[in-house]
């Protein structure tokens, strides 16, 4: 009975993969470190299709949306929402770290820190884009380069323009619209095949990480990790929970609905690995595809709530550990600098540590050499960052859809309460373009 249930449930398969990965990492570390390609390969397979999925979803949504003014309104509301929520996250991290005196009393001297370990990150702070360079970076050199480099913001810009053009041309372009809609079914079917490999990918990632880092790396920096996770939990349940409640949705059923995706993120420390499945599930809840297609890809670059908490928390922690006194002006400087640098993460490998280095560099009072203190626990904190970022973007989509009346709320509540069946497997077919999902089987 259990084996039959496992064969049908991706969630249970991922749990088993995670547990076996931990056991392998602890019991057979030499073998476990060789499992890294399994996790890396799974994420690469997912990323292979992300640009195509964003293109299909956005074009299908906008071409069938009718009013293009609505598309612009959704974009503007999304940017305003992202800025407000990430600012709250930055302030929360700052207040928690400062009020708890996180790191105080460690008395670590700068000459004790191995500065060479941070050169990899401090040397790349110039990759953080300024406002003008960032905006220019949204425009691809060519359409093909945007897809070839997997630059999601550039793909999103082209997709919005392409979908808008289809919308304006109207009936004459109906054949192209149908072709893209049919093509999206093929892409999502491929994604469904790839997602079946999630248990293997999670096993490889967890086995390698457990063997490589173990639990010893948490011993000296446990307070930082625990406070970070506690702060993320408060943000998710109190802040995001309140926002979601205003939209008529409860947080716990909402999290249960995305449990498979959250577990995959927990195993891979990457929210990219579940972007396509999340978009599909939000559409299945009854949210218009055009809204999902605009909010989720944009949020992956601009709405980084977990990263925002991490940034200010880590900066204040490093200041306290190195014995650097912080005046009110220093705290304001940290906040203002973080507001800018936290938006520069897009497209930078190892962006968390690079942007942390850039933030420390921009706040002269805090020694950038302190970055080395968080290196050993960055992967553990990366899980919390990815989970919080993902939940934040899902909540953002529901909230903005509610503002725009683009969500079938009774359907969403029925799915979350278990009265309407959720997708039986992750990564299946996309919903029809430009319509609010209305199909499903009510359970008696």
UniProtKB/Swiss-Prot annotation:
<feature type="transmembrane region" description="Helical">
    <location>
        <begin position="9"/>
        <end position="29"/>
    </location>
</feature>
<comment type="function">
    <text>Responsible for the transport of dicarboxylates such as succinate, fumarate, and malate from the periplasm across the membrane.</text>
</comment>
<dbReference type="Pfam" id="PF00375">
    <property type="entry name" value="SDF"/>
</dbReference>
<dbReference type="InterPro" id="IPR036458">
    <property type="entry name" value="Na:dicarbo_symporter_sf"/>
</dbReference>
<dbReference type="GO" id="GO:0070778">
    <property type="term" value="P:L-aspartate transmembrane transport"/>
</dbReference>
<feature type="transmembrane region" description="Helical">
    <location>
        <begin position="380"/>
        <end position="400"/>
    </location>
</feature>
<keyword id="KW-0472">Membrane</keyword>
<comment type="similarity">
    <text>Belongs to the dicarboxylate/amino acid:cation symporter (DAACS) (TC 2.A.23) family.</text>
</comment>
<keyword id="KW-1133">Transmembrane helix</keyword>
<dbReference type="GO" id="GO:0005886">
    <property type="term" value="C:plasma membrane"/>
</dbReference>
<keyword id="KW-0769">Symport</keyword>
<keyword id="KW-0812">Transmembrane</keyword>
<feature type="transmembrane region" description="Helical">
    <location>
        <begin position="354"/>
        <end position="374"/>
    </location>
</feature>
<feature type="transmembrane region" description="Helical">
    <location>
        <begin position="221"/>
        <end position="241"/>
    </location>
</feature>
<keyword id="KW-0813">Transport</keyword>
<feature type="transmembrane region" description="Helical">
    <location>
        <begin position="78"/>
        <end position="98"/>
    </location>
</feature>
<protein>
    <recommendedName>
        <fullName>C4-dicarboxylate transport protein 1</fullName>
    </recommendedName>
</protein>
<dbReference type="InterPro" id="IPR001991">
    <property type="entry name" value="Na-dicarboxylate_symporter"/>
</dbReference>
<feature type="transmembrane region" description="Helical">
    <location>
        <begin position="152"/>
        <end position="172"/>
    </location>
</feature>
<dbReference type="GO" id="GO:0015138">
    <property type="term" value="F:fumarate transmembrane transporter activity"/>
</dbReference>
<feature type="transmembrane region" description="Helical">
    <location>
        <begin position="42"/>
        <end position="62"/>
    </location>
</feature>
<dbReference type="GO" id="GO:0015141">
    <property type="term" value="F:succinate transmembrane transporter activity"/>
</dbReference>
<dbReference type="GO" id="GO:0015366">
    <property type="term" value="F:malate:proton symporter activity"/>
</dbReference>
<feature type="transmembrane region" description="Helical">
    <location>
        <begin position="190"/>
        <end position="210"/>
    </location>
</feature>
<dbReference type="InterPro" id="IPR023954">
    <property type="entry name" value="C4_dicarb_transport"/>
</dbReference>
<keyword id="KW-1003">Cell membrane</keyword>
<feature type="transmembrane region" description="Helical">
    <location>
        <begin position="307"/>
        <end position="327"/>
    </location>
</feature>
<dbReference type="InterPro" id="IPR018107">
    <property type="entry name" value="Na-dicarboxylate_symporter_CS"/>
</dbReference>
<keyword id="KW-0997">Cell inner membrane</keyword>
């Amino acid at each position: 009975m259990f084996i039959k249930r496992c064969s049908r449930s991706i969630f249970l398969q991922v749990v088993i993969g995670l547990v076996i990965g931990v056991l392998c990492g602890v019991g057979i570390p030499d073998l476990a470190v060789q499992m890294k390609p399994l996790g890396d390969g799974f994420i690469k397979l997912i990323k292979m299709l992300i640009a195509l999925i964003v293109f299909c979803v956005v074009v299908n949504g906008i071409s069938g949306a009718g009013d293009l003014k609505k598309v612009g309104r959704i974009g503007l509301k999304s940017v305003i929402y992202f800025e407000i929520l990430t600012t709250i996250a930055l302030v929360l991290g700052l207040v928690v770290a400062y009020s708890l005196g996180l790191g105080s009393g460690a008395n670590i001297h700068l000459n004790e820190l191995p500065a060479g370990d941070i050169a990899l990150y401090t040397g790349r702070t110039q990759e953080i884009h300024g406002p003008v360079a960032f905006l220019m970076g949204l425009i691809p050199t060519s359409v093909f380069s945007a897809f070839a480099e997997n630059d999601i913001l550039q793909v999103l810009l082209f997709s919005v323009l392409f979908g808008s053009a289809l919308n304006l041309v109207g009936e004459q372009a109906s054949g192209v619209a149908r072709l893209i809609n049919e093509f999206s079914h093929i892409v999502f079917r491929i994604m469904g095949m790839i997602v079946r490999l999630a248990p293997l990918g999670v096993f490889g990632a967890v086995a390698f990480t457990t063997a490589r880092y173990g639990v010893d790396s948490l011993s000296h920096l446990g307070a930082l990790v625990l406070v970070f996770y506690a702060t993320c939990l408060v943000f998710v349940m109190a802040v995001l929970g309140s926002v979601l409640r205003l939209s008529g949705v409860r947080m716990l059923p909402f999290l249960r609905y995305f449990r498979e995706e959250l577990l995959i993120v927990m195993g891979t420390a990457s929210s990219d690995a579940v972007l396509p499945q999340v978009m599909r599930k939000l559409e299945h809840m009854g949210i218009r595809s055009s809204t999902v297609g605009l909010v989720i890809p944009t949020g992956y670059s601009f709405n980084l709530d977990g990263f925002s908490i991490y940034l200010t928390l880590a900066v204040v922690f490093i200041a306290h550990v190195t014995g650097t006194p912080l005046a009110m002006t220093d705290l304001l400087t940290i906040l203002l600098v973080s507001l800018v640098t936290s938006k520069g993460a897009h497209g930078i490998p190892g962006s968390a540590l690079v942007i942390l280095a850039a933030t420390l560099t921009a706040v002269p009072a805090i020694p950038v050499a302190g970055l080395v203190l968080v290196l050993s626990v960055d992967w553990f904190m990366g899980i919390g960052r990815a989970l919080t970022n993902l939940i934040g973007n899902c909540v953002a989509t529901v909230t903005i859809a509610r503002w725009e009346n683009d969500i079938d709320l009774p359907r969403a509540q029925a799915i979350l309460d278990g009265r309407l069946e959720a997708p039986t497997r992750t990564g299946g077919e996309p919903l029809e373009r430009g319509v609010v999902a209305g199909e499903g089987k009510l359970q008696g």
